């Protein structure tokens, strides 16, 4: 039997064991939680300053690093992402002018989405914003805020982060991007109140306000349904049943005609063209002649300047 001293040692050892066990459990929980709670974006950032002369390019090296960190460390939503679920995207800023700490240029934004049961990735977004202007001084911190507009630069970064997340969500579930689209509305409203360029409704058919409207206005909201039908019921199905998946894609394209009838110049139409036209050539390369002609007829009405690619689709070629 244990002596009094021995009993105290036993109790102490038990407490130490329990303490160590508790620490291990907490550590495992934290490690597991951090794995589940990965940030949403896996973003490559590139800044091109070839058009500039007599400028300290270190300014843009610093900005590029800050933007990369901003996109890849900010938690934009409360959703849980595994590391392999992060959205792959690219952000290209081409600087045309930098005077008095004001950057002017354009931004190309791209994002991709994996296709189920395959190694294939599909382009979800490929858009050029031609009206970009913001103030920036080297070393200026980029601060994420939800309910206020910190400055024009972070407003632009937030807009495209949420736009990428919104489109991605819609491709996986019907209106799966609802929360992100709500954030986009708030960002646009705050930016419009600031008077900064690139945000005003009706100012430009392809500015940030127009991008939001292309997916949230009643007359063009079919674009959101198309995102789900095209990707989740179409592309994701093709690698199991090519004919069935392709049929769903064909059905989804009717949304484009609805948008065209409502607004032939709507930015949703050019977004689809820039992201999907090459892909469609490959999708229909093994379709029947009747199916190819049906799709080509629709696309030629929407995109009369793209007849080279549309004729490739019609002929059953593969890119």
Label for each model-derived stretch:
Residues 1-13:
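Single conserved hydrophobic/aromatic residue that forms the stacking wall/gate
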Residues 12-21:
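Positively charged n-region of N-terminal signal peptides that target proteins for export
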Residues 39-104, 115-117:
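Start-of-domain marker
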Residues 46, 233-319:
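A cross-kingdom marker for long, charged
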Residues 101-213:
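Acidic/His-rich structured neighborhood in mature extracellular/periplasmic domains
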Residues 176-269:
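Flexible, glycine-rich surface segments
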